[in-house]
Amino acid sequence: LARQVMLEEQPEYYVVELSSFQLDDMYDFHVHIALIMNITPDHLDRYHYNFEEYAMAKMRILQNQTYEDAFIYWGEDEFLAKYVLAHQPMEQRLLPFHTYPQVGAAADKSDDGLMRLHFENKTFEYPISELALQGPHNLQNAMAASLAALSVGISEDALRKALHDFVNVPHRLEKIAVIDGVRYIN
């Protein structure tokens, strides 16, 4: 990342994955879009085997956000839902996503198989069956990434194309073949 920052030609956006370890020592870092998929009990040895300490380290990503920024999170994660409720009002835009129909969610799944994004008084719908990557976890990834894309002004047409054409890294749930009606996935 340090090398990227020093490049003469700067990209418009950086997408950065940060660990709790990195966030522990960040005080002035400001993200415009924070995205947390879930909080699970990883790396507890570094946090005295205390889940709350670990989770609070992850939440440091929000510490310098303002009303112009967004927090995208899985609304079904118990810790995240409780955190947001306990810290109301939060300054940044809250964009929770759910894998079932949910009133008030920024993204959810309709009963008729659509991924729905409710963003800036518009609804964007996309058939889940047409997502390039299938599976419940990939639906969550698509919802979160789509909310981030809309947050930075990506057009709906570009988003539709990306959701349909996205290619995963090799050997990561890679479609191999369909033989006698059986789908083979590496």
Model-predicted segments: where are they?
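Generic alpha-helical structural context detector
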Residues: 3, 63, 161-164
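Adenine nucleotide phosphate-binding catalytic loops in nucleotide-utilizing enzymes
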Residues: 48-55, 69, 91-186
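Flexible active-site lid/hinge loop adjacent to a nucleotide/diphosphate
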Residues: 8-96, 107-108, 126-132
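Internal, well-ordered alpha-helical segments in soluble enzyme and binding-protein domains
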Residues: 1, 57-61, 79-80, 138-144
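Conserved substrate/cofactor phosphate-moiety recognition/catalytic segment
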Residues: 1-9
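Short acidic loop-to-helix transition motifs that present clustered carboxylates
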Residues: 1, 20-22, 168
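Short, well-ordered secondary-structure micro-motifs
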Residues: 4, 26-27, 174
